[in-house]
Swiss-Prot record:
Keywords: Chloroplast, mRNA processing, Plastid, RNA-binding, tRNA processing. Belongs to the intron maturase 2 family. MatK subfamily. It comes from Pinus cembra (Swiss stone pine). This is Maturase K. GO terms for cellular component: chloroplast. One of its GO terms (molecular function) is RNA binding. InterPro entries: Domain_X (IPR024937), Maturase_MatK (IPR002866), Maturase_MatK_N (IPR024942). GO terms for biological process: mRNA processing; RNA splicing; tRNA processing. It is found in: Plastid, Chloroplast. The keyword Plastid applies. PANTHER family: MATURASE K. Usually encoded in the trnK tRNA gene intron. Probably assists in splicing its own and other chloroplast group II introns. Its main location: plastid.
Amino acid sequence: MDEFHRYGKEDNSRQQCFLYPLFFQEDLYAISHDHYLDGSSSSEPMEHLSSNDQFSFLTVKRLIGQIRQQNHSIVLFVNCAPNPLADCKKSSYSESVLEGLTLVLEVPFSIRSKYSVEGMNEWKSFRSIHSIFPFLEDKFPHSNYISDARIPYSIHPEILVRTFRRLIRDAPSLHPLRSVLYEYRNSPENLQRSIIVVPRVNTRFFLFLWNYYVYECESILFSLLKRSSHSRSLAHRPFPHGTHFHRKIKHIIIFSRRNSLKSIWLLKDPKINYVRYGERSIIAIKGTHLLVKKCRYYLLLFRQCYFHLWSEPYRVCSHQLSKNCSSSLGYFLRVRMNPLFVRTKMLDELFIADLITNEFDPIVPIVPILGLLAREKFCDVSGRPISKLSWTNLTDDDILNRFDQIWRNLFHYYSGSFGRDGLYRIKYILSLSCAKTLACKHKSTIRVVRKELGPELLSKIVFKRTRFDSLPFSSKAAARSQRERIWHSDIPQINPLVNSWQKIQDLKIENLFDQ
């Protein structure tokens, strides 16, 4: 595979024309079979694998030869469940063939994406979801509209094959891909007659389809935005003394009219910022309401024409930042005005200037989180803590660790918000619910539990790791921590409670559009 990568770098055209012979290389299926045994691409537990299962590469070659014929593609999924690509009871042959197919298709994609990423200086790859918020903190105050767009994930299999056809010139190598996609499309459990491509599937094949699909969407969308934008050279140019920004712009426009009309467009052109996490993307726009409507229309039209997809209107929602809050990534996102008083002394005179700046302000959704805690039986509807009866059969350490994990995840995820006072109400509910759960387990009261286990039990054990995470505990430092944001680089996904609330918000938006 390494030699093939080097060979592809030297001659990309030859690399695209000779992918199909790789399906018959034994080394390829040795790699894919090792990946399958390691559990890197399958959700099947290792204890379900039979040690006496003899794997034959000749059998795999015969399966590859038969999969080219549409009528015999079912041979690939012998001894599999009706949904062969999603069920955990898969045969080693089908899994290895899918793994080998993925490895072959990843070769041209990895080379192309590497060259494309090298040409984009602003491209950054981060695993933590908190890496998005510093970008929003920098771009949101200069924007007045925000669009929350969800990428459509229901795709016809032929659309995926045609997308790969633009990249891979070797037509025979696409026959196995077409057979696999249509086999899954025609499975009895797939009622939508389309391929569901989502980034939450553990199968490496589906993860590759999702990454390639999103890459195609964004690469073409970015090229269209760059062509339509007149401020390509001005995008990264800093303006000094941003306090009197509008006054400087007006002065430059008057001066530019004497030279050329193009300079005026460079300064008047709106700014569009794009960021994506998973299947959700955020577009921050600085412009008029008409421009936002046009961007939304063109985005829906682009998906419909290029991918032949009907994208529902509720998948692209626009909000004005100064009036409404947008719910995304588990936060209420808004921009608030922050007044500043600046005193300047020149000789004997003292000048006081009032400056108003926009500030990115993510808000913690306390009320929705309390509703989710009530649904999970940590408290009632009014917010009174109750015992978690389903956990009374666990040990004391397991109960304490579970409550500790819930609070630690919530506190870490919302550490970037200024107003974290509402989180202490959640901490009180969780701590009292933990005490009631222990009391219910030992058939005693909270007072007896604290007397036996110690009055400082909850503060020492349950929340021992979340005491502001090594921040100084002085009063000044505690007050300063309320004014500072802490973005963590070790949060790979949205909190489960927060994700449930985000799904509820999405359903509300869908119901509004249905009405």
